[in-house]
Amino acid sequence: MLIDHVNKSLIYPNLNGGIMLYISNLFDILGRIAFPLFAFFVVEGYFKTKNRTKYLLNLIIFGIISEVPFDMFTSATFFNPRFNNVMFSLALGLITIWIIDVLKTKMSRILWYFISLTIVAVMCLVAMFLAVDYDYHAIIIVYLLYVLYNKPVLSVILGYLSIIKELWAFLGFGFILMYN
């Protein structure tokens, strides 16, 4: 993802054709691979961490620490509230699946699916309101990877379809299939 930010802030603004265009395209492709992997590891972390609260706090703290460099790279300002970094997207995704997981044991399966979709919709609106990176797509991908945790092929296909606008993200989803 760092490669993508370097591309967007240093290479892309200075493009004048030639070899730099190819380098920019390569960096963009490499950057698109990162997000599906981040989303996948949020779900993996949710299931495997000993302390979910600490995990969430680490995402938020790292998001706060990295916001100024992110804003400098993406908008050349110290703070841009209209565009927030991916760590906040991942934190919202974690909060979403945590709420849904807690409710899983408290209601019937059909009601749980309805409620979980409602929670996802609300969290998608929150993501758009907070202007986090990957906005509502982040919430949907984390949710799909969580709900279809034991069906990796289906989760990867639906995850990719939910973010198909990022064409090269399929490479990241391919790496997910190779995990374990």
Language-model region placement:
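Alpha-helical transmembrane segments and their immediate juxtamembrane cytosolic regions
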Residues: M1-N180
